[in-house]
Amino acid sequence: MSNIIKQIEQEQLKQNVPSFRPGDTLEVKVWVVEGSKRRLQAFEGVVIAIRNRGLHSAFTLRKVSNGVGVERVLQTHSPIIDSIFVKRKGAVRKAKLYYLRERSGKSARIKERLGN
């Protein structure tokens, strides 16, 4: 039974997901339904957490919009995600960057990762 579930989950995994880590800045294009129309909406933010669970993997993006912090948890292999683009690689030492929630301005900056 579990082999069948694993096979079905393997078929539903997206193949075009780039590799990213906490601290990276991503631009995610998400399908948004408004009434009867569908359109793409871009959400750009810093990855503050990643949850690796195969088909159920998720990541949390954080951005500051008009002085208000906005966080969005997205399923990595969700059909509403059209594309993921890594804009900037950040150098951080932690896997979960929840401390960025309390910081603003220059203290919330993340250094750029050089090399790989």
Swiss-Prot record:
List keywords of the entry alphabetically.
Ribonucleoprotein, Ribosomal protein
Indicate whether Ribosomal protein appears among the record's keywords: yes
Q: Does the keyword Cell wall biogenesis/degradation apply?
A: no
State the InterPro entries in the record: Ribosomal_bL19 (IPR001857), Ribosomal_bL19_CS (IPR018257), Ribosomal_bL19_sf (IPR038657), Translation_prot_SH3-like_sf (IPR008991)
Q: Show the disulfide pairing.
A: none
List the GO cellular component terms: cytosolic large ribosomal subunit
| Domain of life of the organism encoding this protein | Bacteria
GO terms for biological process, alphabetical: translation
- MF annotations from Gene Ontology: structural constituent of ribosome
List, alphabetically, the Pfam families matched.
Ribosomal_L19
Question: Of which family is this protein a member?
Answer: Belongs to the bacterial ribosomal protein bL19 family.
Function, in words: This protein is located at the 30S-50S ribosomal subunit interface and may play a role in the structure and function of the aminoacyl-tRNA binding site.
Q: Which HAMAP family match?
A: Ribosomal_bL19
Report the protein name in the record: Large ribosomal subunit protein bL19
Give the gene that encodes this protein: rplS
